[in-house]
Design a protein with these regions (language model features):
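Enriched for short, Lys/Arg-rich terminal
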Residues: 1-6, 12-27, 59-92
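A short, surface-exposed loop/turn module that caps and links secondary-structure elements
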Residues: 35-62
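PIN-domain endoribonuclease scaffold, especially VapC-family toxins
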Residues: 24-38
Length: 92
């Protein structure tokens, strides 16, 4: 099964900010994770794990030491919605 990866408005802004910063290694890692999400959103690079308590249902994986990708998996519509690509969860 191949998932469709969709970016929230917030995640799109974060991606633009990363692109403007010019860190090609970080951008390559983000795009590689997008490709992994299409095939297996619960495993792969960046130690994916489901968050707990109030954030249950949201998944996270490390992009680098400073930034994490958070996303929601919608199995019923075969879609992964990326919520954030900046900071550590809600750090701004």
């Amino acid at each position: 099964m191949t998932y469709f990866v969709e970016l929230s408005d917030n995640a799109e802004e974060h991606l633009k900010t990363h692109a403007k910063a010019g860190n090609k290694i970080l951008l390559k890692r983000i795009y590689n994770i997008f490709e992994e999400l299409k095939q297996h959103p619960k495993t792969g690079t960046g130690k994916p794990h489901e968050l707990k308590y109030k954030k249950a249902g949201i998944w996270s994986r490390s992009i680098d030491d400073k930034h994490r990708m958070t996303y929601v998996i919608h199995d019923e519509i075969v879609t992964v919605l990326v919520i954030s690509l900046w900071g550590h969860y809600e750090d701004k």
